[in-house]
Amino acid sequence: MSDFDDSLLDDQEALTRVDAPLRALAGTGARIRMDAAELVRPDLGPGYRPRGVVIVGPESRLVRALLEPCCPVPVVAWPFAGLPAWTGPLDLVVVLAGSVGAGPDEVSSSAEAVRRGAAVIVAAPADSQVARAADSSSTVRIRTRSEDALGSAVAAVSILHELGLCPPVRPGDVAERADMVAEESSPFHDLSDNPAKDLALALADAMPLAWGDSVLAARAARRVAEALRRASGRPALAAVSAELLPVIEGAPAHDPFADPDDGPARLRPVLVIFDDGERSPAGDEQRDRLVAAAELHDVRVCAVLADDGGALDRYVTLRQKGLYGAAYLELGLSGRRT
């Protein structure tokens, strides 16, 4: 018997159970605009070009993924306290933090960057500990006001574009993508006209296998898999195709004569492809292998699509669509705990 009650997805009283996460998701665009409201043109000297870029804090790997394909200098996402031993006055350190400031690692990295004489871009509230630690004559300050690490990352990337380190990123456009997903995923749209609710229904009795067809799509897949695990308390795997194929190939055969009311539902894998429109021969080959294996082993395939806008626009679209799906999955499963 399925634990998922799809009638809850269109029940206005039941929807109050996930009011907090839905409101948080709906406010993503507003938070991005808020954190980008006070952006200033960086003044690090004419023709400034760092030897390398070190990124620390939440969403550092997202910023690295955006920079790596086109940045003319090496880029490192540093997950520890302090900084790499080679960091010095010729380098740029980017520190990301939310409105609650940052953890001790980010504060340590900020202070170390100043001590070594590196240029610093810090995205943090003006009165936070990390902003104070990063204070120097060569610090570019982005005064953020929300708790959303994504907003800090978007603001920082727009500054990095001004320095010629990445393609154009317009925070307003990114925010608009988040707003568009919020509109189409609104709880006031019923299941027949709501892709996020439809995704939740597809994953009702499933073990999601999330795969992205590009670096950023794969990152969105990992973020969504994390949310699905929290929402359902079930396994959800985001991995490269070589790691997903054995799971698909080992899926138990589907029994069309099984009684759905006879015992608990058996979780079967569902392949969820996050497609941001980036195409490469290697990515196309991996996709074809995954889909072929899924068809052979009677594994359902779902697609989350974003094929319009810049790289960060598409990433945010994929991420938001998946996170809305996770929220509705949590709602559909909430009956088992009531």
Q: Where are the regions that the model predicts?
A:
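A generic structural motif
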Residues: 75-82, 123-125, 144, 234-246, ...
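Active-site phosphate/pyrophosphate-binding segments
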Residues: 12, 17-20, 24, 30-45, ...
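Glycine-rich, anion-gripping cofactor-binding loops and their flanking helix/strand elements
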Residues: 85, 93-108, 248-281
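Short helix-loop-beta junction
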Residues: 64-76, 226-237, 293-298
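Structural motif
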Residues: 55-59, 96-99, 123-125, 211-215, ...
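Glycine-rich phosphate-binding loops that contact phosphosugars or nucleotide phosphates
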Residues: 47-182
